């Protein structure tokens, strides 16, 4: 039906007869000549119809936007004044010889040349995908998967599919359940990840596995979550955590280089606890230069009293965390009030700020917002501790840990945005390591920080300790610009250690047998040391396309309620 794609033509094709297929993007009837822009997934090119060909011109005059057509014509160079160098095809046009209309189009319910409300976009997704930005996102997503597959093949990884209909095994989120027609009162679960299957592949002797896998989690949604999502799933035998990270660094560096021509610099590494103490989150955006500073040993804010006092053993239940904000004095009162309101959402304790004035020595600079003036000595120490300079502002808060870190971490993000401290053209990859193996939920029960198959450091658990939250996991998350794009760990390959972890998690022997017996049995047969990671393809694509929502990089996404507006799913089943 066609000889070429619209966006691939250039001046080297001048004089050639070609055939194109696509959609009318724009038309202009100038009485003696008629121009249309024809569009396909590769781009747009201008087509010229001359009135000298009366029948052809008359047929072209009936064209409207989004008609699906075929054009036969000759490539010709535009006259100089009509060349459009902002288009890849702007130096040429097609002189039409034949026109075929495959299908007419009604006026579209969305505008492909401007923004549309998201509900309309998702309802008419098949039309929304015609937008150049959406086509670009889909093409980039495709290119990313090709780069990853080529990298994996080069590094001797095997692409192996694992089951979609599987057994329900608790992994953190709720499962999507599929009833079995043949096995009455029994159910399949859609996989939250291929975790156990890829570990079984390691036991089977497959050294290096990967899969671009569809996963399903029935959890609360937000802009960077979907109920079904795609992950780059990877597992290797006989490699430690450091070597796994090196492989992933090479792969991610290759993707960034080939997609956006950016060479990522050294991947930094922080422990989980250092990340919390320095940035208030385990997913810090390192483009933001603001860091949290513990100043408890300098000052302490008494509860409900707006004054600074010397540290006191009786008041050390709270800690004091400060931040020095570069050029913070440029913030107007509305911004500062908004920060106080932000803090008040999480605590009744007051947020304080200190302004640093004048180009005099640091020990002489001070201007504060305290109702009771602090001792100058403490203020000098605070300014010195935070390395504050002229024009900076210091914020600090007294609260219990870890809440104080969480609050100041949120404030840090807002300040970075409001003061334009973030270089949005830079990339800061970061590994977060040494997570706690366990944490407690709202019922004060131990749960896995990642999943129950994560190994502790050194493959040991001292069961005599009373606080299992102190046990460090051999795990690692990859964070880029504040987004977690991957999470992995060394896995447990010892049967008794796996049982110990299950017991700590409250998974008794009966539950172990019902849910994990197949896996525990497999661990008996020469299980190799192994490790792996899962990277979010959707999030990676979101970052590389500079999108702000996962829905912009998935062809047919769900809403925040898990609905597909295009098809109306979920829906009642009507039997024929």
Swiss-Prot record:
CDD domains associated with the record: AspRS_core (cd00777), EcAspRS_like_N (cd04317)
Region (Aspartate): 195-198
Binding site for L-aspartate: 171, 217, 450, 491
Subcellular location: Cytoplasm
Main location: cytoplasm
SUPFAM superfamilies noted in UniProt: Class II aaRS and biotin synthetases, GAD domain-like, Nucleic acid-binding proteins
GO biological-process terms attached to the record: aspartyl-tRNA aminoacylation
Gene3D superfamilies xrefs: Bira Bifunctional Protein, Domain 2 (3.30.930.10), GAD-like domain (3.30.1360.30), Nucleic acid-binding proteins (2.40.50.140)
Top-level taxon in the UniProt lineage: Bacteria
Keywords of the record: Aminoacyl-tRNA synthetase, ATP-binding, Cytoplasm, Ligase, Nucleotide-binding, Protein biosynthesis
Root EC class: ligase
Name of a matching Pfam family: tRNA_anti-codon
Single GO MF annotation: nucleic acid binding
GO CC annotation terms, alphabetical: cytoplasm
Signal peptide (residue range): none
Recorded catalytic activity of this chain's protein: tRNA(Asp) + L-aspartate + ATP = L-aspartyl-tRNA(Asp) + AMP + diphosphate
Positions of ATP binding: 217-219, 226, 484, 536-539
EC number, as in UniProt: 6.1.1.12
Subunit structure comment from the entry: Homodimer.
Protein function: Catalyzes the attachment of L-aspartate to tRNA(Asp) in a two-step reaction: L-aspartate is first activated by ATP to form Asp-AMP and then transferred to the acceptor end of tRNA(Asp).
PANTHER family referenced in this protein's UniProt entry, alphabetically: ASPARTATE--TRNA LIGASE, MITOCHONDRIAL, ASPARTYL/LYSYL-TRNA SYNTHETASE
Protein family membership: Belongs to the class-II aminoacyl-tRNA synthetase family. Type 1 subfamily.
Name of the protein in question: Aspartate--tRNA ligase
